Amino acid sequence: MSMKKINFVIVLLLFNFSNLFGQSDLDKFIDNWHLSATKANYETYFGAMDDSFIFLGTAPGERWSKDEFSNFSKPYFDKGKAWDFKASNRHWNYSKNGKTAWFDEDLDTWMLDCRGSGILIKKKGEWKLVYYNLTVLIENEKMKEFLELRDEKK
């Protein structure tokens, strides 16, 4: 094998390992964020968010800034019972400059199967969550029943 090929393989391996290690750190970051809600650790949960954070919840009117979401959530955290989301099947994507990462994940929750998606930015060497969208998953064949339930509430 020529030196050019060897060097190319080494660079390729280093790049892939650095992405894996970065992804592992981000997985830990998001896992810890979910765990802090489970343990009702208010400071850790909201400390992971940038001041510009936006949370989209499952109800039509749920679009909260960090402060709004914090005010809504604080009583749950104060009671020691926030929520318990178990994540799996997480997928990551990254900007070319490495300062933005976005993901989607499957969630096992009290609402059964949900999906979350989020965006993180790196500021001053630290990752912060700027956006999270929580959705309840509904099979297509159950959509008609779901729409009928929504109509009943109007």
PLM feature spans:
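Bacterial Sec-dependent N-terminal signal peptides
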Residues: M1-L26
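Short, low-complexity, Pro/Ser/Thr/Gly-rich segments in the mature regions of secreted, periplasmic
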Residues: K142-K154
